[in-house]
Amino acid sequence: MESLIKINFQKIKSVGIRVDFNVPIDENFVITDATRLLRAAETIKFIKEKNCKILLISHFGRPKDIFENQYSFQNLIEQFSKILNEKINLISFDDFSKKGLSHFKQSKENIFLLDNIRFFKGEKTNDMNFSQSITDELDLFINEAFSASHRSHASVNQMAKNILSLPGFNFEKEIIAINEIKNSPKKKLAIIGGSKVSTKINTLLSLTQSCSNIFIGGAMANNFLKFKGIPVGESLLEADSDKMIEEIYDNAKKSGCEIHLPLDVVTDKVETFSIDKLSSNSNFKILDLSDSSINLLDNLISKSEIVLWNGPMGMIENENFSRGSSKLASLLSHSSSQVVIGGGDTLLAINIAGINFDQFYFVSTAGGAFLEALEDKVLPGVEALNLG
């Protein structure tokens, strides 16, 4: 993989960096989690130290191909500057629409942010002309938004094809971590939570080929428990999941991968039951794991060299049902295994547990892109950089 460190910057004066500043905010536009900003900081600082002018490009939310004030970076630019400790200048939607990047070219300032790239009609259509209107003013394009790289959008795919393009430092780390999960001969455990089997079936099928053990938690486990004939009361279930689950078990059996399910659960009445004690006559909802399940996870983790965690183990937004995920986060933070964590809700679970991300081998900020990469899908953002 070609790296930024090896590039000769003698003739490179203007650099575009596709970042992911699609940060969570509260009702007052205050950023509640700056992780994605901070992940781009190393690349931004590196390019700045090369005395290059920087154009940052990002999306925010889901505007409808037109300026919408609630999705404008004008509401967040001051916070971006403060968090990154850099003066960042906004190129507004109107300014770019009328004058292109003329202000970027003529100004003596160093770092600019184009307003929400999804305001522009050429973005989601991966339009060549729109892409060139930006890359014609650049000498180098860097993708530092792995989390958006499953989108075939102009700022992810076409811009990277127009000029010399490279991955950012965090993008490289994402690729390396995912390749470790898929290709390393080390003994691997996948811990998969979330609510729907259908959204993760391809990921699970892929993981049965590379992992020795898979633990299913979260609301998704309800479907697996029901498939095994265990009563789940009024717990959240996905319709027509049996065929998918049967396929997962068949693939796992052929590959020598063992599927593990919770041994005990916490219900909506904050009562703990072993799964063999759940009654078919009771009105209950399964909302978390309990101690026996955590002990099983502890045992599986201790036998694994690489551990992947994606998806919370319970309804973490309620403190009564976040304990299972917090206990798991604590176990993983003290493990000697290479722990790779991915998915927005999983990151929230770690934050709720009060554990620092640097206690793990790697924490991915990507959601859909992370899962699609595990499924061996070709991501448009990766393909454009010729990274495989």
PLM ranges: what are they?
Residues 1-388:
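Active-site loop-to-helix "anion-binding N-cap" substructures in soluble metabolic enzymes
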